[in-house]
A protein has these predicted regions:
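Solvent-exposed, non-transmembrane regions of membrane-associated and secreted proteins
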Residues: 1-251, 261-269
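Conserved PLP-enzyme active-site core in the AAT-like
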Residues: 256-259
Length: 273
Protein backbone atom coordinates (compact mmCIF):
# COMPACT_ATOMS: atom_id res chain seq x y z
CA UNK A 1 0.00 0.00 0.00
CA UNK A 2 2.81 2.45 0.80
CA UNK A 3 4.38 1.85 -2.61
CA UNK A 4 1.01 2.26 -4.35
CA UNK A 5 0.43 5.51 -2.47
CA UNK A 6 3.84 6.86 -3.51
CA UNK A 7 3.37 5.82 -7.15
CA UNK A 8 -0.09 7.41 -7.21
CA UNK A 9 1.31 10.68 -5.86
CA UNK A 10 3.82 10.77 -8.71
CA UNK A 11 1.09 9.95 -11.24
CA UNK A 12 -1.27 12.62 -9.87
CA UNK A 13 1.51 15.23 -10.00
CA UNK A 14 2.27 14.30 -13.61
CA UNK A 15 -1.42 14.40 -14.54
CA UNK A 16 -1.71 17.80 -12.87
CA UNK A 17 1.26 19.19 -14.82
CA UNK A 18 -0.27 18.00 -18.10
CA UNK A 19 -3.64 19.45 -17.12
CA UNK A 20 -2.10 22.83 -16.29
CA UNK A 21 -0.32 22.87 -19.66
CA UNK A 22 -3.63 22.14 -21.39
CA UNK A 23 -5.35 24.92 -19.44
CA UNK A 24 -2.61 27.39 -20.30
CA UNK A 25 -2.85 26.54 -23.99
CA UNK A 26 -6.66 26.69 -24.07
CA UNK A 27 -6.76 29.98 -22.15
CA UNK A 28 -4.38 31.51 -24.67
CA UNK A 29 -6.71 30.40 -27.47
CA UNK A 30 -9.79 31.58 -25.56
CA UNK A 31 -9.08 35.19 -26.50
CA UNK A 32 -11.05 34.37 -29.62
CA UNK A 33 -14.79 34.37 -29.01
CA UNK A 34 -15.43 31.04 -30.76
CA UNK A 35 -12.55 29.20 -29.05
CA UNK A 36 -13.06 25.59 -27.85
CA UNK A 37 -12.72 26.68 -24.21
CA UNK A 38 -15.42 29.33 -24.52
CA UNK A 39 -17.65 26.88 -26.39
CA UNK A 40 -17.14 24.24 -23.68
CA UNK A 41 -18.10 26.66 -20.91
CA UNK A 42 -21.19 27.75 -22.82
CA UNK A 43 -22.22 24.13 -23.44
CA UNK A 44 -21.66 23.16 -19.81
CA UNK A 45 -23.65 26.11 -18.54
CA UNK A 46 -26.50 25.22 -20.91
CA UNK A 47 -26.38 21.62 -19.67
CA UNK A 48 -26.60 22.72 -16.02
CA UNK A 49 -29.54 24.98 -16.79
CA UNK A 50 -31.31 22.19 -18.69
CA UNK A 51 -31.07 19.53 -15.98
CA UNK A 52 -32.31 22.06 -13.40
CA UNK A 53 -35.23 23.04 -15.62
CA UNK A 54 -36.03 19.35 -16.20
CA UNK A 55 -35.75 18.69 -12.44
CA UNK A 56 -33.10 16.07 -13.18
CA UNK A 57 -35.84 13.74 -14.39
CA UNK A 58 -33.28 11.34 -15.90
CA UNK A 59 -31.48 10.84 -12.58
CA UNK A 60 -32.61 7.45 -11.28
CA UNK A 61 -29.45 5.93 -9.83
CA UNK A 62 -26.39 8.24 -9.90
CA UNK A 63 -24.08 5.20 -9.81
CA UNK A 64 -25.51 3.73 -13.01
CA UNK A 65 -24.18 6.44 -15.35
CA UNK A 66 -20.69 5.33 -16.28
CA UNK A 67 -20.36 7.53 -19.35
CA UNK A 68 -20.18 11.30 -19.25
CA UNK A 69 -22.57 13.59 -21.08
CA UNK A 70 -19.52 15.37 -22.48
CA UNK A 71 -16.54 14.24 -24.53
CA UNK A 72 -13.87 16.77 -23.54
CA UNK A 73 -11.52 15.65 -26.31
CA UNK A 74 -13.81 17.45 -28.77
CA UNK A 75 -12.84 20.67 -27.02
CA UNK A 76 -9.13 19.92 -26.87
CA UNK A 77 -9.06 18.60 -23.30
CA UNK A 78 -7.25 15.28 -22.84
CA UNK A 79 -8.18 12.35 -20.59
CA UNK A 80 -11.66 13.75 -19.82
CA UNK A 81 -10.31 15.67 -16.80
CA UNK A 82 -12.42 18.73 -16.04
CA UNK A 83 -10.43 19.91 -13.02
CA UNK A 84 -9.18 19.07 -9.54
CA UNK A 85 -10.73 18.76 -6.11
CA UNK A 86 -8.67 19.82 -3.10
CA UNK A 87 -9.78 18.97 0.44
CA UNK A 88 -7.28 20.42 2.96
CA UNK A 89 -8.68 18.57 5.99
CA UNK A 90 -8.29 15.21 4.24
CA UNK A 91 -4.96 16.31 2.73
CA UNK A 92 -5.98 15.19 -0.75
CA UNK A 93 -5.83 16.63 -4.24
CA UNK A 94 -7.49 14.50 -6.91
CA UNK A 95 -8.24 14.94 -10.60
CA UNK A 96 -11.95 15.07 -11.47
CA UNK A 97 -12.87 12.83 -14.40
CA UNK A 98 -16.15 13.05 -16.29
CA UNK A 99 -17.85 9.66 -16.20
CA UNK A 100 -18.13 7.37 -13.17
CA UNK A 101 -16.62 4.26 -14.76
CA UNK A 102 -14.18 1.90 -13.05
CA UNK A 103 -11.13 3.15 -14.98
CA UNK A 104 -11.72 6.76 -13.95
CA UNK A 105 -12.48 5.83 -10.33
CA UNK A 106 -9.18 3.95 -10.13
CA UNK A 107 -7.34 7.19 -10.98
CA UNK A 108 -9.16 9.82 -8.95
CA UNK A 109 -12.52 11.44 -8.27
CA UNK A 110 -15.38 11.40 -10.78
CA UNK A 111 -18.26 13.67 -11.68
CA UNK A 112 -21.58 11.85 -11.42
CA UNK A 113 -23.47 12.18 -14.68
CA UNK A 114 -26.94 13.77 -14.62
CA UNK A 115 -25.74 16.19 -11.90
CA UNK A 116 -24.40 19.71 -12.41
CA UNK A 117 -21.00 20.08 -14.04
CA UNK A 118 -18.29 21.67 -11.82
CA UNK A 119 -18.45 25.27 -13.02
CA UNK A 120 -20.51 26.73 -10.19
CA UNK A 121 -23.49 29.03 -10.48
CA UNK A 122 -26.95 29.35 -8.97
CA UNK A 123 -29.15 26.25 -9.06
CA UNK A 124 -26.27 23.79 -9.34
CA UNK A 125 -25.12 20.77 -7.36
CA UNK A 126 -22.05 19.00 -8.72
CA UNK A 127 -21.84 15.50 -7.23
CA UNK A 128 -18.28 14.16 -6.99
CA UNK A 129 -17.60 10.55 -6.05
CA UNK A 130 -14.46 8.62 -5.15
CA UNK A 131 -13.50 5.32 -3.57
CA UNK A 132 -12.77 5.25 0.16
CA UNK A 133 -9.43 3.91 -0.96
CA UNK A 134 -8.01 2.01 -3.90
CA UNK A 135 -4.96 -0.28 -3.62
CA UNK A 136 -3.57 1.77 -0.76
CA UNK A 137 -4.40 5.13 -2.38
CA UNK A 138 -6.41 7.24 0.14
CA UNK A 139 -8.92 9.14 -2.09
CA UNK A 140 -11.99 9.77 0.16
CA UNK A 141 -10.66 7.38 2.81
CA UNK A 142 -10.78 9.96 5.63
CA UNK A 143 -14.10 11.57 4.69
CA UNK A 144 -15.46 10.96 8.21
CA UNK A 145 -13.08 13.52 9.68
CA UNK A 146 -14.81 16.26 7.66
CA UNK A 147 -16.59 18.87 9.76
CA UNK A 148 -19.12 21.62 9.21
CA UNK A 149 -17.24 24.64 7.84
CA UNK A 150 -14.35 22.68 6.28
CA UNK A 151 -13.15 24.02 2.95
CA UNK A 152 -13.47 22.17 -0.35
CA UNK A 153 -11.82 23.68 -3.43
CA UNK A 154 -12.63 22.98 -7.07
CA UNK A 155 -10.16 24.06 -9.74
CA UNK A 156 -11.74 23.80 -13.17
CA UNK A 157 -10.53 24.95 -16.58
CA UNK A 158 -11.58 28.54 -15.93
CA UNK A 159 -11.35 29.40 -12.24
CA UNK A 160 -11.01 28.27 -8.63
CA UNK A 161 -14.26 27.76 -6.72
CA UNK A 162 -14.34 27.58 -2.92
CA UNK A 163 -17.01 25.79 -0.91
CA UNK A 164 -17.68 25.06 2.77
CA UNK A 165 -19.19 21.92 4.28
CA UNK A 166 -22.76 22.69 5.34
CA UNK A 167 -24.32 19.28 5.95
CA UNK A 168 -23.44 15.59 6.28
CA UNK A 169 -25.62 12.51 5.80
CA UNK A 170 -25.50 8.75 5.54
CA UNK A 171 -27.94 7.53 2.90
CA UNK A 172 -28.93 4.43 0.94
CA UNK A 173 -27.43 3.94 -2.55
CA UNK A 174 -30.89 4.31 -4.10
CA UNK A 175 -31.62 7.67 -2.45
CA UNK A 176 -31.01 9.72 -5.61
CA UNK A 177 -33.29 12.49 -4.33
CA UNK A 178 -30.64 13.25 -1.70
CA UNK A 179 -28.21 14.55 -4.34
CA UNK A 180 -30.61 16.71 -6.34
CA UNK A 181 -30.05 20.41 -7.05
CA UNK A 182 -31.34 22.69 -4.29
CA UNK A 183 -33.00 25.76 -5.76
CA UNK A 184 -31.04 28.98 -5.40
CA UNK A 185 -27.88 27.26 -4.16
CA UNK A 186 -24.41 26.72 -5.64
CA UNK A 187 -23.25 23.37 -4.27
CA UNK A 188 -20.72 20.58 -4.49
CA UNK A 189 -21.57 17.22 -2.92
CA UNK A 190 -18.98 14.56 -2.06
CA UNK A 191 -20.12 10.95 -1.95
CA UNK A 192 -18.41 7.65 -1.19
CA UNK A 193 -19.20 4.11 -0.04
CA UNK A 194 -19.89 3.48 3.66
CA UNK A 195 -19.04 1.81 5.99
CA UNK A 196 -15.47 1.22 4.93
CA UNK A 197 -15.07 -2.24 3.29
CA UNK A 198 -18.80 -3.06 3.72
CA UNK A 199 -20.18 -0.39 1.37
CA UNK A 200 -23.93 -0.88 1.81
CA UNK A 201 -24.53 2.83 2.52
CA UNK A 202 -23.28 6.12 1.10
CA UNK A 203 -21.50 8.83 3.09
CA UNK A 204 -22.47 12.24 1.73
CA UNK A 205 -20.88 15.62 2.44
CA UNK A 206 -22.75 18.68 1.19
CA UNK A 207 -20.82 21.88 0.50
CA UNK A 208 -22.09 25.36 -0.35
CA UNK A 209 -20.24 28.08 -2.24
CA UNK A 210 -18.38 30.52 -0.02
CA UNK A 211 -19.74 34.03 0.42
CA UNK A 212 -17.66 36.85 1.87
CA UNK A 213 -20.25 37.69 4.52
CA UNK A 214 -21.34 34.11 5.26
CA UNK A 215 -20.79 32.59 8.69
CA UNK A 216 -20.22 28.85 8.43
CA UNK A 217 -21.74 27.73 11.71
CA UNK A 218 -24.98 26.60 13.35
CA UNK A 219 -25.62 24.15 10.51
CA UNK A 220 -27.62 20.98 11.12
CA UNK A 221 -27.44 17.45 9.87
CA UNK A 222 -30.60 15.65 8.77
CA UNK A 223 -31.45 12.01 8.03
CA UNK A 224 -28.96 9.87 9.97
CA UNK A 225 -27.05 12.27 12.21
CA UNK A 226 -23.29 12.44 11.76
CA UNK A 227 -22.32 15.82 13.17
CA UNK A 228 -23.94 19.20 13.80
CA UNK A 229 -21.01 21.53 14.22
CA UNK A 230 -17.37 21.50 15.25
CA UNK A 231 -18.15 21.69 18.96
CA UNK A 232 -20.66 18.82 18.84
CA UNK A 233 -18.58 16.46 16.69
CA UNK A 234 -18.26 13.13 18.52
CA UNK A 235 -14.74 12.18 19.55
CA UNK A 236 -15.32 8.41 19.33
CA UNK A 237 -13.95 6.79 16.20
CA UNK A 238 -16.42 4.97 13.97
CA UNK A 239 -16.06 1.35 12.86
CA UNK A 240 -14.89 2.57 9.45
CA UNK A 241 -12.19 4.74 10.99
CA UNK A 242 -10.88 1.83 13.08
CA UNK A 243 -10.73 -0.34 9.95
CA UNK A 244 -8.92 2.42 8.05
CA UNK A 245 -6.34 2.83 10.82
CA UNK A 246 -5.81 -0.94 10.90
CA UNK A 247 -5.30 -1.14 7.12
CA UNK A 248 -3.03 1.89 7.16
CA UNK A 249 -0.68 0.83 9.94
CA UNK A 250 -0.80 -2.99 9.92
CA UNK A 251 1.88 -3.26 7.17
CA UNK A 252 4.21 -1.06 9.25
CA UNK A 253 3.53 -3.10 12.39
CA UNK A 254 4.24 -6.26 10.40
CA UNK A 255 7.60 -4.89 9.27
CA UNK A 256 8.52 -3.96 12.86
CA UNK A 257 7.58 -7.43 14.14
CA UNK A 258 9.58 -9.13 11.39
CA UNK A 259 12.53 -6.90 12.23
CA UNK A 260 12.34 -7.79 15.92
CA UNK A 261 12.11 -11.51 15.11
CA UNK A 262 15.15 -11.21 12.87
CA UNK A 263 17.11 -9.50 15.66
CA UNK A 264 16.09 -12.24 18.12
CA UNK A 265 17.21 -14.95 15.69
CA UNK A 266 20.56 -13.24 15.13
CA UNK A 267 21.19 -12.75 18.86
CA UNK A 268 20.11 -16.34 19.65
CA UNK A 269 22.40 -17.68 16.92
CA UNK A 270 25.39 -15.77 18.28
CA UNK A 271 24.78 -17.07 21.82
CA UNK A 272 24.71 -20.68 20.57
CA UNK A 273 28.09 -20.16 18.90
Amino acid sequence: PLVNKYENKIEVNETKKNFEKTVEKLQEESKEEDSPLNKLYSDMKAYNEKIYKDKQSDLKDPWSYEQSSFDLTKYGVENNIIGYIIVPHMEIELPIYLGANSDNMAKGAVHMSQTSLPIGGENTNCVIAAHRGYKGIPMFCDIEIMEIGDEVIIKNLWETLKYRVSNIKIINPSDSQEVLIQSGKDMVTLITCHPYTKNYKRYVVYCEREKDDEENNNQTVSNETVTANKEDKPKKLSESQYRILFDRYSPLVGVVIMGLLLIVLIVTGKKKK
